[in-house]
Amino acid sequence: MYFTEEHEVFRESFKDFLQKEVVPHIDKWEKTGNIDRFIWRKFGDMGYFGLSYPEEYGGLNLDIFYMVIFLEELQKINSGGFAAAIWAHVYLAMTHVNVEGDVRIKNKYLGASISGEKIGCLCITEPFGGSDVAGMRTTAIRKENSYVIN
């Protein structure tokens, strides 16, 4: 089995957190289409947004199995909207900042995203590609002090 005793302790702790802090609000959030701001900070305070991110930005730099547990338990609360919002923040937005951002960008946004102070998203669309990031056809070519977008 891939999961250690530490992983299972994390699983139980995260399940308890979700039941106490998230589940009581799900119906309201689903009905209004808005997730209260306080929960983002609570996720950050508990370290959940930083599981796999570098320690120098406030992350915990843990192995991938913590992320697997995080996603498994998040899905079990039966709120696709909430799970998608958290997933988009942690994986779509923050991953790009972590992988592609220079130190200045990481200092400004990655730590604030890990703490829950800022909420990330990834907004991309093309006429024929929709939101399929891998299928993007637009290019940006640097020409002197600007870019040519095609």
Regions found by a protein language model. Name each.
Residues M1-E6:
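Intrinsic disorder at enzyme termini
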Residues H7, L18, D102:
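Residue-level signal for inorganic ion chemistry
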Residues E8-E12, I77-G80:
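A ubiquitous short alpha-helical element
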Residues V23-N150:
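Glycine-rich flavin
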